[in-house]
């Protein structure tokens, strides 16, 4: 088996999203020996779709079992015993995967017909152990060109060295636009955090730092569906806590795997951005019932791991003067930060019709 594509699904029986995703994977150009890549290689790039239902309460699993029955040998329907969120569903897929390459997709996204052919060809011809591409951001189910997002940069590619690892720590980019050699995953015992949102904030950098050769296809081959009505776009305190936990797990993994010291400055920035700054402002914007005690917990966490994060050169460059001013105020007093932020937001809404 050349490729295993792992796709978690949860409560996807309605709206046709599951079907659109699955059909895009079933209609890949590889798997029948007739693609240009397969003819050139003299072999069939056979692939399997590991469709994992994350203990849905609707008919998602029933639909996946029907796909399995209709496409034996191509689709394998799996189900988690309890809801483990995306990381747990992916881990179940990994445990059952047989492909030389492993790819991931989110259940409400889809792939261009030649996505996996092009990624595999790039990996097979270069000897890379991870291959990525760019993506489309779309708001409807279509194969038309959307907003193109250029993901990883070409200066991150090739045989990886310390400078490239630093760039990948700073910007690993999404895992769903990549395929990974299963041998690298197995050798490094790579998995995903379970039972939480933002699992990629931990897994993404760790997986990239565990690889030795990264290549990229400079084409948007993945369609990322942005449904603003989806609950995944709503901010809750639990999601903020999950983001914080993902940051803590990233630091733990880097310590255990020997990445902490050589990439300390980059890790400090990644933690400051993902754990602290993103959480601070999304919490203040999106959570309805805010607590000073949460702001205190967030402050304790960043100061415990990286007390001098505000001196980080990447931090100084990434964030604007107002963001850094607000963070400094938070470091002085969570209460003062809260009062000032609320007053600033109210003022802007009143006089300018905006709010951070």
Residue ranges and their predicted role:
Residues 110-215, 225-235:
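Donor-binding/catalytic cores of nucleotide-activated saccharide
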Residues 286-356:
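Membrane-interface aromatic/basic loop that binds lipid-linked glycans or pyrophosphate carriers
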Residues 195-196, 204, 213-246, 260, ...:
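Nucleotide-sugar-dependent glycosyltransferase catalytic core
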Residues 11-38:
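Short, well-formed alpha-helical segments that are part of the catalytic scaffolds
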Residues 2-6, 48, 202:
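Cell-envelope/extracellular polymer assembly enzymes that use nucleotide-activated donors
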Residues 80-97, 104, 118:
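Glycine-rich, basic loop-to-helix element that forms the pyrophosphate-binding segment
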Residues 29, 33-55, 76-80, 107:
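Short beta-strand/loop segment that forms part of the nucleotide-sugar
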Residues 24, 53-62, 82:
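A conserved acidic beta->alpha catalytic loop
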């Amino acid at each position: 088996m050349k490729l295993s594509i792992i796709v978690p699904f949860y409560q996807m029986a309605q709206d046709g999203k599951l079907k659109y995703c699955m059909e895009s994977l079933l209609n890949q150009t590889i798997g029948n020996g007739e693609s240009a890549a397969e003819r050139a290689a003299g072999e069939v790039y056979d692939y399997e779709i590991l469709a994992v239902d994350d203990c849905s309460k609707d008919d998602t699993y029933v639909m996946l079992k029907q796909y399995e029955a209709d496409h034996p040998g191509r689709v394998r329907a799996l189900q988690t015993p309890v809801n483990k969120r995306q990381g747990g569903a992916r881990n179940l897929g990994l445990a059952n995967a047989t492909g030389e390459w492993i790819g991931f997709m989110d259940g409400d996204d889809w792939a261009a017909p030649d996505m996996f052919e092009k990624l595999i060809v790039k990996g097979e011809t270069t000897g890379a152990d991870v291959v990525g591409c760019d993506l489309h951001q779309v708001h409807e189910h279509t194969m038309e060109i959307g907003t193109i997002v250029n993901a990883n940069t070409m200066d991150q590619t090739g045989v990886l060295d310390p400078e490239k690892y630093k760039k990948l720590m700073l910007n690993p980019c999404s895992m769903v636009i990549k395929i990974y050699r299963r041998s690298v995953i197995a050798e490094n015992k790579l998995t995903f955090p379970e039972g939480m949102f933002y699992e990629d904030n931990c897994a993404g950098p760790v997986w990239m730092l565990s690889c030795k050769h990264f290549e990229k296809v400079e084409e948007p081959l993945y369609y990322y569906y942005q449904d603003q009505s989806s609950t995944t776009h709503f901010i809750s305190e639990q999601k903020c806590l999950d983001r914080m936990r993902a940051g803590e797990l990233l630091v733990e993994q880097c310590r255990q795997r020997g990445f902490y010291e050589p990439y300390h400055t980059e890790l400090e920035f990644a933690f400051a951005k993902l754990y602290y700054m993103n959480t601070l402002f999304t919490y203040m914007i999106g959570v309805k019932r805010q607590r000073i005690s949460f702001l205190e917990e967030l402050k304790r966490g960043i100061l415990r791991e990286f007390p001098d994060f505000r001196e980080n050169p990447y931090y100084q460059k990434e964030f604007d003067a107002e963001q850094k001013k607000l963070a400094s105020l938070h470091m002085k007093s969570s209460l003062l930060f809260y009062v000032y932020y609320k007053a600033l937001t109210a003022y802007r809404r009143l006089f300018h019709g905006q709010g951070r």
